[in-house]
């Protein structure tokens, strides 16, 4: 049982707001540097890789400062080596580059904390190719965000030719 609703912070407004989480639209670096609140848990969900290394150092420092005495920081990220997604050429290039950065970020995180624990989990997913293509069209991962319309369209065609109906 929680006494307070969890707080979600993002730089974009969310349309699909979870009623069990209070969301505010603000830059996380700004919020963590200015807040006087203390937290039991600070969770970074697939977002830390959007920051520059200098910003990551700052946000980790501010986050540690904002923890209660037994508080925890959890950072969710992709496993740097075990990602088996159906990929098209440009997507693969972007993903490899992103995972290299994630590995460097992991090193930075390790050097920022005396005590840390790393857990990996494997989540096996089966879906239809059509469902996956819709996810690609919606740019479900940050690797797809900056692709041009043409690159995305060509990638979708590549996936259609390269993979079976069930992924």
Predicted features and spans:
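C-terminal helical/coil "lid" or tail adjacent to the Rossmann-like core of SAM-dependent
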Residues: 122-166
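Short catalytic micro-motifs in class I SAM-dependent methyltransferases
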Residues: 46-50
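Short alpha-helix
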Residues: 97-113, 117, 126, 130, ...
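A short glycine-rich, Lys/Arg-flanked "PGG" loop and its adjoining helix->strand segment in the class I
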Residues: 57-72
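Acceptor-substrate binding/catalytic loop of class I
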Residues: 90-106, 118-124, 142-149
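Conserved class I S-adenosyl-L-methionine
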Residues: 72-102
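A conserved beta-strand element that flanks and buttresses the S-adenosyl-L-methionine
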Residues: 43
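Class I SAM-dependent methyltransferase SAM/SAH-binding core
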Residues: 1-32
């Amino acid at each position: 049982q929680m006494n307070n609703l969890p707080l979600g912070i993002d730089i974009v407004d969310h349309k699909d707001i979870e009623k069990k989480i209070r969301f505010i639209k603000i830059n996380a670096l700004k919020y963590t540097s200015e807040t006087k609140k203390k937290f039991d848990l600070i969770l970074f969900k697939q977002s830390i890789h959007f920051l520059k290394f200098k910003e990551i150092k700052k946000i980790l420092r501010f986050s540690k400062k904002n923890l209660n005495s037994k508080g925890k920081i959890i950072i969710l990220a992709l496993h740097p080596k075990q990602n088996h997604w159906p990929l098209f050429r440009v997507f693969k290039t972007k993903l490899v580059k992103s995972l290299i950065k994630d590995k460097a970020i992991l090193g930075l995180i390790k050097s920022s904390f005396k005590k840390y624990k790393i857990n990996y989990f494997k989540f096996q997913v089966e879906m239809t190719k059509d469902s996956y293509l819709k996810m690609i069209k919606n740019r479900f991962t940050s690797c797809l965000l900056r692709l041009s319309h043409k690159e995305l369209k060509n990638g979708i065609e590549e996936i259609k030719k390269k993979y079976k109906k069930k992924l």
